[in-house]
């Protein structure tokens, strides 16, 4: 079964020699999948394994999906330049991960996306935006 999801990468854990086990947060909930070969030097999908990668992920497989393709929607890597912004965004990702079973994922996904964009693109204090997301 092939499907594509629009998701934000929450976490990537090393698996085998060059693979990552990733947790993707989408409007449908959390999806755990494998990104193959992205730890190699010339990997084409390396961008899709970065924290806060906002992409359309192409998945193949039912029980344990494998990411076969990804196209980036927006680049949130600029948040890494500011420690406070980065920390606030990572806290929001962790909160979204832990609360995904108890909340409406579609609403939570959109709220997370709005909060990350607020932190990156506006002059609002990152701590205030993160606190508002967590409420």
Question: Whereabouts are the PLM-identified features?
Answer:
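Non-catalytic alpha-helical scaffolds and adjoining flexible linkers that form interface surfaces
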Residues: 1-21, 25-135
């Amino acid at each position: 079964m092939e499907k594509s999801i629009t998701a934000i990468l929450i976490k990537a854990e090393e698996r085998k020699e060059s693979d990552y086990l990733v947790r993707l947060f989408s409007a449908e909930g959390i999806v755990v999948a494998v990104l193959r070969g992205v730890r190699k030097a010339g990997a084409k999908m390396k961008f899709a394994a970065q924290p806060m990668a906002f992409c359309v992920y192409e998945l193949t497989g039912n029980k344990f999906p494998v990411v076969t393709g990804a196209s980036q929607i927006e680049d949130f890597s600029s948040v890494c330049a500011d420690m406070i912004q980065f920390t606030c965004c990572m806290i929001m990702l962790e909160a979204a991960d832990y609360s995904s079973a108890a909340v409406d994922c579609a609403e939570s996904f959109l709220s997370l996306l709005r909060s990350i964009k607020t932190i990156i693109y506006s002059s609002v204090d990152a701590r205030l935006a993160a606190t508002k997301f967590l409420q």
